[in-house]
């Protein structure tokens, strides 16, 4: 038997520890001070000790799994209190998912108090300690190993990895793991929590992960709860937002629309190509058929084409008048008689007419005294009752206007990338040029200098402190500065801080930066520096807002720093707003003059765009003036009809041209004055565009009137007033047609809700109407006076000086341009072989334009609105190149919603027990599809953070037990007690009056290391509490858009945000809540127009064309087909304008839409005169009538509009403003060239083919009127 004793002894030694481990401790109680107020635990190897009964509540709160039998534990009450204190930060972020926090508490409860500690804890370092209170020698536990089951660690991590931190828009583990949430895993998370360098652990705990026994140690493998499981009967599983497996399949975006293709090619190209070829086939086939048919009837091809043989496209119009012909003839005769009498009256009574005209002009233009010019971009681009404008007003009223932004984007072009080598080991980390410490010091100097800028307003000094956003004021008056330097508390000393020795640097600004970009809301980093990341203003500084040019989320690779100074905006408080303007002016001046060869700075202030728009308008005044001078000179010289050098100063009409121009400008002034009387403000687009438009319309009428007189012979026995009356009777109807068509088109265009189009249309319509009235009154009288001067041989301008009498006198003659049109251009254009070519070319161009009309870009590049030399252009470029986050977007829930009921809470919140289709959850789901929805991050949710804050397990919500006033978590006062009891009822969410009782406390609580959930900084402005803190008004839930670079991006972001909000609203309504959710971002008011720009364009152009059609139909005396042909031609011009816009890179927006509406009006000038001349012609065939119309009206249209406008437009090409060069020079040039070619080439050809038949009643009336006079011979041309 003795031989077996050694083996038996060894077996007993192996078995005995197992028996000891079953109920054995490694520590009990607290001993010496470790760091700060943290203590070591006392080493103890005995059995667990019964917990005093006054600690029962605490163990039930923290470790209910250990509350059994006589509650014998390996910890005392002080250790439990320390555990509670150390777990406050994880509690605040993880308690929203009970199963996650349950597993975490299991890990720490087993570590701190488990009666089986010795199974999985192994003390590896101790030191002696003398307790001065008990006068006993004890042993501090300085280090130990914690054997944790790998499966337990993985299960705990899996339950927590999806938990959100609503106030910081990121995963909670990103704040608790010491690294980015994406890099966090089960092992490095637990290692971080047990590392004494994290600021919470008093000593080092080395976790050892294994599911198998190691060296006789049994890993802690307690049961865990999945995030989709309930912890107890009171709490439910975690929400979808905090537990992805609860959500089911991840939502998928709808597939992008497939491009419309036919045979692998763009469908529009194919369709229009096929259509064009088919048209050519039909058109030329019809011509060939007619030609062959005519060959059967004509003896020779030289037989006159103006025969009435059947099927002739040029057949003459014989036969009886139709039923509408007499009506048209009567109406035309009525107009002719009325204008004839009026013209004669004006010539006979020039003094009276001119006096009343001047009086009218004076009265109307005096309204300019009350003129208001709108430069506010919101007023310019957003309709007062548009959805975006109303939502902006609602947001501003309830939460205050969105803050003013002063922003700098800084690069370090002369600095290279440097490499940081972490201690003691790890991969090298590259740091971008601007993250060089010397550069950071220089940027900090700049930032401090900007903070020191002062301005003067009303003899008061204005500083940044006076106007900045300070969310924790008055407790913390530091301004919000979104800058990477806020990670270093905006301090040179903190930036230079480092921990190391003579050989190594253990921690410096690199380590602090790497931690803070992962946990921007942290109050204590994990390095030896232990510095806060939270900004000095009390809020987090998110890396995507202060860094630019990095890849993915590697913030250390940043190539740009972004510094933003949010400044308070004010709702209906002009006085305080002017203070901000004054400071911004000094800010702009300072940064413009700042010199540092190591830094490249792009910047903007809130007022920058408005300032630059004003500067742009002023800088291009000279260009616009030159443009008008060129047109004035041309008009003044071209009106004269010089017959000989000796009569140069007599026959010139410079004074008449100047008078005509002044009449045009007076009509503009009258229009501005009339609407200024009404209190309607002007816009820059009105001032810049309308004179151009009215000059085109007015000059054309002047040329028609003057040139008709110059070609006219005075009849026998006819006086001057009778002659001018007769001439006005002939041409005034066509002037009336064009002017009234344009006036109607513009006034109907004012139905548009777009402010730019609405205002322009009203002012333009009134200006054109007044211009017409002044031309048939004042100008006719002036023309009569000028003719009398000419007949008396007096010099132009110097009208009192009589010229030499050469005996020639003035007589009617044809100008060179008229003879060119009559003898060469018109006959050539209407040749049988050329007309088909003209039709083919113009229809081809039309087909191309239709094919590309859907490819015109929509929007307005912001940089185009700035002068070429503007500093804001550099800012826009840097914005697109470097920034990685878009503007903030607020989902606003309108006032009246019931947050105090469980049902109401569930429809909004995103935590445990909340609906899977709640407001927060739907925004969270949208952020998961950020490339589609353009929502970049999960929303910050005040209600979820409030529930965590008010939870009885948290140390955040406490009251003084005597006064019942709020007690901040940082206050160490034994009279402070938790707000709600630690009972099953207390653990439930507050409802009813209790919900409102603690909410104001939450919104006024500043975050601190003991409670990071204080809502003052994050939610102080997010919740309206009204009715003396009795109920909640409007609230918002904020997130950020993804980076937006183009107009299409901005428009799509707004569209998707509205879709999300609409879905939330519909979901709430389906559950009985009739309150609306809408999104708001600062740019919505500017980009809303692009959501409907296509519909607005179709509406405005259709209304304009429709009104032109109706006026033309009436004025031409029910000539239906003439009105149709004219509108077809104008429509072709408009479609071709879209083709030019696509070719020339002109986008569709409010500015280009105004120009399109204007081009519709100017097209009338090119088409209406020739169309009416065609209908009035009594020639025998369509070709002859088209030739006569083109010869007589073409020269006036060409000289009156085309040449006048062309000279002025060319000058605009030299404008400094990009918006002038693109939207005015390019579009004006296009509309003049397209109008001229269609009006002078295509329209006559079209009329020669399908023009209306001659009005028999008009022909009869005309013959009867001129029978027996010398004008009878002119009827046959």
From Swiss-Prot:
Residues 1-22 form the signal peptide. Belongs to the patched family. A motif (Di-leucine motif) lies at residues 1274-1277. This is NPC intracellular cholesterol transporter 1. Residues 620-785 form the SSD domain. The lineage of its organism: Eukaryota, Metazoa, Chordata, Craniata, Vertebrata. It is found in: Late endosome membrane; Lysosome membrane. Disulfide bonds join 25-74, 31-42, 63-109, 75-113, 97-238, 100-160, 177-184, 227-243, 240-247, 468-479, 516-533, 909-914, 956-1011, 957-979, 967-976. It catalyses: cholesterol(in) = cholesterol(out). One of its GO terms (cellular component) is membrane. InterPro entries: HMGCR/SNAP/NPC1-like_SSD, NPC1-like, NPC1_MLD, NPC1_N, SSD. Detected in liver (at protein level). Ubiquitous. Detected in adult heart, spleen, lung, liver, skeletal muscle, kidney, testis. Intracellular cholesterol transporter which acts in concert with NPC2 and plays an important role in the egress of cholesterol from the endosomal/lysosomal compartment. Unesterified cholesterol that has been released from LDLs in the lumen of the late endosomes/lysosomes is transferred by NPC2 to the cholesterol-binding pocket in the N-terminal domain of NPC1. Cholesterol binds to NPC1 with the hydroxyl group buried in the binding pocket. May play a role in vesicular trafficking in glia, a process that may be crucial for maintaining the structural and functional integrity of nerve terminals. Glycans are attached at residues 70, 122, 137, 185, 222, 228, 414, 459, 478, 524, 868, 898, 916, 961, 968, 1063. Cholesterol binds at residues 41, 79. One of its GO terms (molecular function) is cholesterol binding. Keywords: Cholesterol metabolism, Disulfide bond, Endosome, Glycoprotein, Lipid metabolism, Lipid transport, Lysosome, Membrane, Signal, Steroid metabolism, Sterol metabolism, Transmembrane, Transmembrane helix, Transport. The record marks 108 as: Important for cholesterol binding.
């Amino acid at each position: 038997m003795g031989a077996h004793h050694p083996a038996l002894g060894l077996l007993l030694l192996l078995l005995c520890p197992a028996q000891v481990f079953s109920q054995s401790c490694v520590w009990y109680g607290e001993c010496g001070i470790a760091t700060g107020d943290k203590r070591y635990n006392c080493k103890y190897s005995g059995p667990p000790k019964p917990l005093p009964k006054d600690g029962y509540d605490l163990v039930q709160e923290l470790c209910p799994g250990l509350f059994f039998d006589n509650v014998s534990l390996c910890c005392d009450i002080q250790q439990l209190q320390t555990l509670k204190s150390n777990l406050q930060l994880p509690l605040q972020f993880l308690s929203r998912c009970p199963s996650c926090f349950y597993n975490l508490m299991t890990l720490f409860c087993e570590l701190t108090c488990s009666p089986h500690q010795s199974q999985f804890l192994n003390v590896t370092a101790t030191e002696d300690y003398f307790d001065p209170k008990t006068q006993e020698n004890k042993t501090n536990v300085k280090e130990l190993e914690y054997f944790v089951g790998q499966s337990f660690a993985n299960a705990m991590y899996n339950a927590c990895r999806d938990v959100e931190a609503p106030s910081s828009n990121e995963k909670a583990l990103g704040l608790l793991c010491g690294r980015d949430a994406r890099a966090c895993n089960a092992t490095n998370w637990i290692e971080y929590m047990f590392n004494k360098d994290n600021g919470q652990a008093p000593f080092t705990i080395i976790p050892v992960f294994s599911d198998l026994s190691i060296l006789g140690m049994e890993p802690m493998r307690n049961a865990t709860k999945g995030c989709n499981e309930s912890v107890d009967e009171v709490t439910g599983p975690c929400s979808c937002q905090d537990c992805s497996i609860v959500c089911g399949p991840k939502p998928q975006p709808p597939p992008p629309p497939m491009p419309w293709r036919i045979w692998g090619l763009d469908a529009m190209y194919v369709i229009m190509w096929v259509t064009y070829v088919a048209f050519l086939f039909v058109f030329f086939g019809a011509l060939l058929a007619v030609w062959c048919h005519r060959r059967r009837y004509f003896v020779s091809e030289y037989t006159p084409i103006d025969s009435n043989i059947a099927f002739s496209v040029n057949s003459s119009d014989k036969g009886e008048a139709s039923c509408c012909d007499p009506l048209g003839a009567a109406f035309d005769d009525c107009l002719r008689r009325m204008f004839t009498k009026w013209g004669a009256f004006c010539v006979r009574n020039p003094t009276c007419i001119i006096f009343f005209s001047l009086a009218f002009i004076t009265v109307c233009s005096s309204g300019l005294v009350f003129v208001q010019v709108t430069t506010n971009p919101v007023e310019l681009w957003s309709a007062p009752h548009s959805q975006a404008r109303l939502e902006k007003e609602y947001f501003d009223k309830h939460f205050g206007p969105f803050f003013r932004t002063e922003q700098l984007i800084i690069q370090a072009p002369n600095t290279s990338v440097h490499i940081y080598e972490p201690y003691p080991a790890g991969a090298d980390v590259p740091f971008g040029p601007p993250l060089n410490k010397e550069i950071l010091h220089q940027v900090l100097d700049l930032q401090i200098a900007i903070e020191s800028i002062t301005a003067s307003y009303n003899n008061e000094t204005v500083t940044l402190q006076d106007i900045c956003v300070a969310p924790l004021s008055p407790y913390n008056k530091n301004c919000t500065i979104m800058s990477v330097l806020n990670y270093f508390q905006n301090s040179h000393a903190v930036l230079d801080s480092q921990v190391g020795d003579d050989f190594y640097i253990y921690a410096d600004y690199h380590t602090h930066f790497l931690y803070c970009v992962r946990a921007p809301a942290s109050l204590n980093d994990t390095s030896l520096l232990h510095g806060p990341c939270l900004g000095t203003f009390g809020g987090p500084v998110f890396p995507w807002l202060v860094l630019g040019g990095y890849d993915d989320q590697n913030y250390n690779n940043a190539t740009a720093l972004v510094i933003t100074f949010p400044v308070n905006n004010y709702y209906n408080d002009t006085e305080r707003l002017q203070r901000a303007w004054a400071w911004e002016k000094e800010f702009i001046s300072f940064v413009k003059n700042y010199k540092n060869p190591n830094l490249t700075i792009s910047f903007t202030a809130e007022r920058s765009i408005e300032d630059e728009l004003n500067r742009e308008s002023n800088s291009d005044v000279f260009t616009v003036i030159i443009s008008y001078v060129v047109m004035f000179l041309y008009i003044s010289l071209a009106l004269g009809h010089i017959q000989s050098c000796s009569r140069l100063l007599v026959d010139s009409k410079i004074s008449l041209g100047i008078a005509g121009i002044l009449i045009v400008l007076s009509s503009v002034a009258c229009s501005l004055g009339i609407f200024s009387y009404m209190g309607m403000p002007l816009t820059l687009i009105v001032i810049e565009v309308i004179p151009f438009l009215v000059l085109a319309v007015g000059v054309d009428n002047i040329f028609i009137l003057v040139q008709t007189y110059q070609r006219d012979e005075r009849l026998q026995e006819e006086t001057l007033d009778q002659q001018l009356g007769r001439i006005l009777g002939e041409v005034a109807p066509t002037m009336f047609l064009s002017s009234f068509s344009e006036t109607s088109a513009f006034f109907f265009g004012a139905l548009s809700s777009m402010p730019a189009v609405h205002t322009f249309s009203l002012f333009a319509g009134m200006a054109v109407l007044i211009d017409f009235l002044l031309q048939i009154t004042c100008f006719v009288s002036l023309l009569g006076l000028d003719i009398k001067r000419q007949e008396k041989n007096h010099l132009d301008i110097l009208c009192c000086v009589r010229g030499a009498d050469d005996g020639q006198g003035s007589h009617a003659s044809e100008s060179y341009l008229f003879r060119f049109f009559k003898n060469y251009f018109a006959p050539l254009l209407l040749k049988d072989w050329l007309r088909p070519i003209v039709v083919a070319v113009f229809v081809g161009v039309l087909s191309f334009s239709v094919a590309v009309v859907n490819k015109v870009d929509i929007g307005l590049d912001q940089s185009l609105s700035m002068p070429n030399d503007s500093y804001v252009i550099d800012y826009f470029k840097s914005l697109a190149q470097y920034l990685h986050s878009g503007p903030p977007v607020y989902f606003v829930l309108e006032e009246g919603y019931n947050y105090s009921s469980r049902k109401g809470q569930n429809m909004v919140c995103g935590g445990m027990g909340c609906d899977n289709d709640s407001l927060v959850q739907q925004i969270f789901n949208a952020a998961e599809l950020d490339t589609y929805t353009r929502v970049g991050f999960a929303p910050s949710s005040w209600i979820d953070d409030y529930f965590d804050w008010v939870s009885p397990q948290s140390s955040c919500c406490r009251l003084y037990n005597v006064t019942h006033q709020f007690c901040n978590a940082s206050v160490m006062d034994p009279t402070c007690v938790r707000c709600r009891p630690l009972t099953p009822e207390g653990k439930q969410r507050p409802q009813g009056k209790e919900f409102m009782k603690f909410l104001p406390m939450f919104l006024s609580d500043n975050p601190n290391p003991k409670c990071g959930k204080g809502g003052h900084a994050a939610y102080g402005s997010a919740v309206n509490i009204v009715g003396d803190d009795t109920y909640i008004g409007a609230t918002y839930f904020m997130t950020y858009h993804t980076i937006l670079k183009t107009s299409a991006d901005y428009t799509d972001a707004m569209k998707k945000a509205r879709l999300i909000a609409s879905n939330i609203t519909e979901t709430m309504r389906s559950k009985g809540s009739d309150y609306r959710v809408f999104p708001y971002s600062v740019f919505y008011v500017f980009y809303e127009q692009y959501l409907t720009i296509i519909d607005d364009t179709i509406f405005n152009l259709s209304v304009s064309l429709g009104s032109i059609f109706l006026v033309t139909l009436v004025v031409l005396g029910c000539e239906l087909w003439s009105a149709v042909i004219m509108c077809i031609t104008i429509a072709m011009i408009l479609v071709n304008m879209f083709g030019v816009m696509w070719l020339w890179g002109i986008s569709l927006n409010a500015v280009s839409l105004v120009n399109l509406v204007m081009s519709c009006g100017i097209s009338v000038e090119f088409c209406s005169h020739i169309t009416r001349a065609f209908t009035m012609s009594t020639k025998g065939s369509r070709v002859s009538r088209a030739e006569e119309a083109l010869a007589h009206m073409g020269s006036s249209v060409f000289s009156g509009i085309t040449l006048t406008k062309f000279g002025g437009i060319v000058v605009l090409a030299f404008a400094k403003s990009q918006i002038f060069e693109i939207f005015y020079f390019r579009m004006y040039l296009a509309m003049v060239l397209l109008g001229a070619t269609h009006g002078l080439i295509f329209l006559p050809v079209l009329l020669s083919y399908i023009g209306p038949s001659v009005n028999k009643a008009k022909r009869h009336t005309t013959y009867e009127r001129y029978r027996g006079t010398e004008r009878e011979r002119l009827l046959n041309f």
